[in-house]
Amino acid sequence: MKGLYIHIPFCKQKCKYCDFVSFPCMEDTADKYVDALKREAEQYRGEKLDTIFIGGGPPSILTPKQIEEVTKMCFDVFDVASDCEFTTEANPGTIDDDKINAMLNGGINRISVGVQSFNDDELKKIGRIHDSKTAYNTICHLDKMGFQNINLDLMTALPSQTFESLKNTLNTAVSLPVKHISAYSLIIEDGTPIEKEYSKGLLDIPNEDTDREMYMYTVDFLGKNGFKQYEISNFAKGGYECRHNVKYWTGEEYIGLGTAAHSYIGNCRFYNTSDINEYIGGAEKEVIELTENDKIAEFMITGLRMNRGVSKTDFKSRFGKDINDVFGSEFDKFIKLGLMQYIDGRYSLTLDGINVSNSILCEFV
């Protein structure tokens, strides 16, 4: 079965670090956009799905009626498994009871809340529209309303973030009724407001060494509090790993609907335009046929992000080659350095390897 990703490119206020495709939300434009989603979905009518993920600007910016239309489309057009994991993203400050009810009634059973921090000063410096109290109350209310599978997103290496403020954020996070936590380091993207402020010396952002120490502390703290790391940036209580994202990391097929979304089907990737007007107007997809080397590189880079790593057997069945014939020298080098390990037929990163994963993964391209 495939996964389905739906991109909602609207936001109330763009965060200072964000370089994603997003636009101010006007109801008439959003209505046209939802109609365009329905039109695109028809290209895949009857496809079997066992995961759905609505992401973007966030989706909670939509009206209850628009949320209802999007969820109804999923079940009308696709063959959705009875145990489908159906996730939507939401931000504190953009959600209310009518929207929550539309989500639950529409079959959504998992929600990912963009908290980032429980420190108000840090939130202001990255341009979030909510404060820590709103974030805390939102998660408690989602639980009360019936969401039993809640993820919260956190960020480290934020402007003025200290170990003390990080510890407070993590303590608050694990005290909440959540089953999954994602923790990402702030990446300063070119052309974003935060990059401009940083280049002018207006922000005190933790250096690379401190960022790594914060990451290692986060991994250790979450593990001790029942959240097992299963991917570089993702932690879950038993049985609550994000099945949709695992599809990406294990090279399974998925469909992408909406601006800037892409699909992976067969040997091809299909890319949608990032221009919302072109998308609403029915712009054609860009199609790129993947070479075997492309697929091998993706298999390695995404697979090694997961704690379980990559399987020799899986590699052989997919590509008809022994993984050691292709990457034997790389494995030997990183195992000797203590950055990788080989256990029960799988190559994976050690904790030290995870800490410098970017430099390791580029060796497998």
Locations of the language-model features?
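Immediate flanking context of iron-sulfur cluster ligation sites
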Residues: 1-8
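A short, conserved structural fragment
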Residues: 335-345
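Short amphipathic alpha-helical interaction segments
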Residues: 321-333
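Local cysteine-cluster metal-coordination motifs and their immediate loop/turn environment
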Residues: 9-20
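A short, polar/proline- and glycine-enriched secondary-structure boundary/capping micro-motif
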Residues: 267-269, 337, 359-361
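Minor-groove-contacting beta-hairpin "wing" of winged helix-turn-helix DNA-binding domains
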Residues: 346-350
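C-terminal scaffold of the Radical SAM
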Residues: 1, 22-321
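Short, amphipathic alpha-helical interaction segments positioned at domain boundaries
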Residues: 352-365
